[in-house]
Amino acid sequence: MGRKSMDIFSSERSLIGRLFQKSILGLFLAFLALVSPFMGAAKADRIKDLGYFQGMRTNQLTGYGIVTGLAGTGDSSLQYTIAAMTALSARFGLSMPSNVSPTLQDAAAVIITADLPPFAKPGQTIDITVSALGRARSIRGGALMITPLYGADGQIYAMAQGNLEVGGLGISGRDGSNLTVNIPTAGRIPSGATVERAVDPGFASAPYLQFNLSEADLTNVQRVATAINNALGPGRAHVLDGVSVAITAPEGAEIRTALMGEIENLPVDRADARARVTINARTGTIVINGAVRISPAAITHGRLTVRVDENYGVSQPNAFGQGQTAVTPNSTITAEQTRSPMFHLQNGANLTDIVKAVNAIGATPGDLAAILEGLKQAGAMNADLIIL
């Protein structure tokens, strides 16, 4: 009876898993089939959609601080937390004997990170992310003490402080049981830092303006230079390499800012992207762009299913014997391989053909990834295969 129930449960679970995988893959393939007719077509974009001007960049800030007000979920013995709280107490005139090492269960050492956007001015606020550094179980409900945020040059660019917003939850019982939802040791503080120092973008006094593509492309960089010359006059823009375009402009922040605003809104025809297939092995996500083409190839893909059934029996000795009652496990391992029909891809098969062929054999995302890897190894797919 136990074996039959377990077989039924295993069959239902495997059936649900197959239906879930097929439904997810079906949605993915339907999406690809819907957008594939439009992916290869050239579209007029703005220059600002292809890259950015030199100096208009985000800078990362980092700081180390203390979160207080935790309900016994903080760091109990981390020396950094103790030293920081001792220094904070001394700042407010509270001295602590040197031989005293307090236990701070309501405080936690944290790392604060933030992105300083371009042209941020003193007095503006930015969002920050707070993450536990030590043994804190949760920082939910805590408040970050005032903390300086440093740039890569070691200068202070912002000051952070505020109450945390934590989406995770962690609860522990006295018997050792615990319940954790999401990540309770990381949170955010919207507008939690005030900018104290501005970053000079440096474009006002540079010998020329420089526009950089977000991704190197020889065709796109030439088209950007051509669009700028057509709008501003011949010889104003010169290609430096596969990423950068140099633009001559009069000196001065006001005139260059106006010129940059005009340039970034110029239309340009984006070149077709390189054929690329991206596979995220952890999530099963597969992205195929419309430039992928397939050479003649025949494909078949089998599926191997391994099943382990666990049953337990009881070994009961005689009443007058010296043996002991014991539980004896009984494992049954079976392997089943299913065969899929072979399908043939014609020369120059595009994304739609791949979607139809893979959908016809009912492949899962894992099967599709294996098929694409096989096509690449066989030299039948002219695309960059990127596995994350």
UniProtKB/Swiss-Prot annotation:
Subcellular location: Periplasm; Bacterial flagellum basal body
Pfam families with a match to the protein in the record: FlgI (PF02119)
Signal sequence bounds: 1-44
Entry-linked NCBIfam families: PRK05303.1 (NF003676)
Function, as annotated: Assembles around the rod to form the L-ring and probably protects the motor/basal body from shearing forces during rotation.
Family per similarity comment: Belongs to the FlgI family.
PANTHER family reported in the protein's UniProt record: FLAGELLAR P-RING PERIPLASMIC PROTEIN FLGI, FLAGELLAR P-RING PROTEIN
Protein name in the entry: Flagellar P-ring protein
Lineage of origin: Bacteria, Pseudomonadati, Pseudomonadota, Alphaproteobacteria, Sphingomonadales
